[in-house]
Design a protein with these regions (language model features):
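Conserved NTP-handling cores and scaffolds of large molecular machines
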Residues: 281, 297-304, 354, 433, ...
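Intracellular, membrane-proximal regulatory regions of polytopic membrane proteins
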Residues: 1, 125-136, 151-176, 326-454
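A short secondary-structure junction motif
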Residues: 223-226, 296-300, 376, 380
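Conserved catalytic alpha/beta cores of large enzymes that bind or transform nucleotide phosphates
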Residues: 322
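Membrane-spanning alpha-helical segments of multipass transporters and channels
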Residues: 290-293
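Alpha-helical transmembrane segments and their membrane-interface boundaries
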Residues: 1-273, 277-288, 301-312, 329-338, ...
């Protein structure tokens, strides 16, 4: 995984650098260049460039996001409270859109990163191009980002540097149930984000004056990608640790370098690359290096390095507390519920792959669903380390039991086998998702049935 993520990081950075140089050729100011890099990172992570339909949607969404982010940046500078309202609404909308399927969810994910960067990089009007070109430039940069991300990814896949794009098949496990009293998870997470960001802006504007940005930034990062309240608490710890280390290194570097000189720009780009590369290993790495990049981009102002570091850490801790409080107190999403749903999705994919009636059986869909299970596993494994001695069974054990089935499942699918005993065990495991006490035993039985047929 480490080598694949490194290759993806290299391809993403090549696209980002090419787009950045194109933007600088049009306007030497730093604003469009920063926007170019951010849009490339967002597009690469959304994977909308992987197919024609996604590229068409990105061609519409990216320019809109680009223009909107600059508009919000202007509002935050000249009308802070109005800018805060628009920022909160936009971020919450990007989460609420998850309810409309995979493609819309990926398009909504484009909103986040450009809006995050404007928190630490204030809008500066361009002075080197005409007013008309300044209005068109965000759209031009967005389309350049789409062009170069698509070109580099297509070339990398053609050269077999990256694997062919895979899209998870839509298999309906059980329709989400919603009511006016208990909305579905995406709606609850959107409400949580709206409440958290609103509190962060109010606390920042009222009590911290010019220091509000990092409070809002941390609140968003802790709550983004919410996979349940345990996940938010886990990420808040990683965010504080990673951001603290990142801020420390950024501060030490700026003591010996001038803000925004060539060396600083090189370190910013290197930090972004390493953050993309190591993100699949742990969120802590992403938190560390994205904080380092943003801190170098923003620079430091203060009477002493020690005071700047303590103030920045104070802002990060306050933002993390707000994010965790919203996740646990405002329409909380149970982490075990998220995990059970993702395990059920994986079992549905496995059942489909081992169904004799399925014309084309392949392991990719099951593996992609299993990847989604593994994304929520770190928080549960950390919880198991702390509470393992007090519990005989832990949800992290469910993940381990399912992962133990991976190689056996691949062998059965690739060999075209559909043993009845295994299919029966899969059915029993899917039924056990309704009874947490039975899940571990059912998954262990599934593993034993697979072992006897491989």
């Amino acid at each position: 995984m480490i080598f694949r993520s490194m290759r993806e990081a290299i391809v993403t950075m090549l696209a980002a650098l090419t787009t950045m140089f194109c933007a600088l050729a049009i306007d030497p100011e730093s604003g469009p260049a920063i926007l170019a890099v951010v849009l490339c990172l967002s597009l690469s992570r959304s994977q909308l460039d992987r197919d024609l339909r996604g590229r068409l949607e990105a061609a519409i969404t990216l320019p809109a996001v680009s223009v909107a982010s600059l508009g919000v940046a202007m509002l935050l500078l000249h009308a802070p409270w109005i800018g805060a309202v628009v920022f909160v609404a936009s971020m919450s909308l990007s989460i609420w859109l998850r309810r409309f399927g995979q493609l819309v969810r990926r398009a909504g994910s484009l909103i986040a990163l450009p809006f995050v960067v404007i928190l630490t990089t204030p809008y500066v009007p361009t002075t080197r191009i005409s007013h008309t070109m300044a209005l068109l430039l965000p759209i031009i940069v967005a389309l350049l980002a789409l062009l170069w991300v698509t070109v580099f990814h297509l070339l990398a896949r053609r050269l077999r540097w990256l694997p062919q794009a895979r899209v998870l098949s839509e298999v309906v496990v059980s329709p989400p149930r919603s009511s006016s009293l208990r909305p579905i998870a995406s709606t609850r997470m959107a409400i949580q984000m709206a409440v958290a960001l609103t509190v962060a802006f109010v606390v920042g504007y009222v009590y911290f004056s010019e220091r509000w940005a990092w409070i809002v930034l941390t609140t968003y990062i802790v709550g983004s990608g919410n996979q349940g309240r345990l996940d938010v608490a886990y990420k808040s710890v990683l965010r504080i640790l990673g951001a603290g280390v990142g801020t420390f290194f950024a501060l030490m570097f700026t003591v010996h370098a001038r803000p925004h000189d060539t060396t600083t720009i090189g370190w910013i780009l290197a930090s972004v690359f390493i953050g993309i590369w190591l993100r699949p290993l742990s969120y802590a790495w992403w938190a560390l290096f994205v904080t380092l990049a943003l801190a170098l981009l923003q620079g430091f102002e203060g009477p002493s390095a020690q005071q700047v570091l303590s103030l920045r850490l104070e802002e990060i801790v306050i933002g993390a507390i707000i994010g965790v409080a919203a996740a646990w107190l405002v329409l909380p999403v149970r982490s075990t519920g998220v995990l059970r749903l993702r395990i059920a999705d994986s079992l549905a994919m496995l059942a489909n792959a081992l169904d004799p009636a399925t014309a084309l059986r392949r392991p990719e869909d099951f593996l992609l669903a299993l990847d989604r299970v593994e994304r929520v596993a770190p928080a549960f494994r950390a919880s198991r380390l702390l509470t393992g001695r007090f519990r005989t069974a832990h949800p992290a054990d469910w993940v381990d039991a399912l992962i133990d089935c991976r190689q056996h499942a691949i062998s059965l699918i690739e060999n075209g086998e559909t043993p009845g005993e295994v299919r029966k065990a899969i059915g029993a495991a899917r039924k056990a998702m309704r009874e947490p006490e039975e899940i571990l035993r059912a998954l262990q039985n599934l593993h034993r049935s697979m072992t006897s047929h491989v």
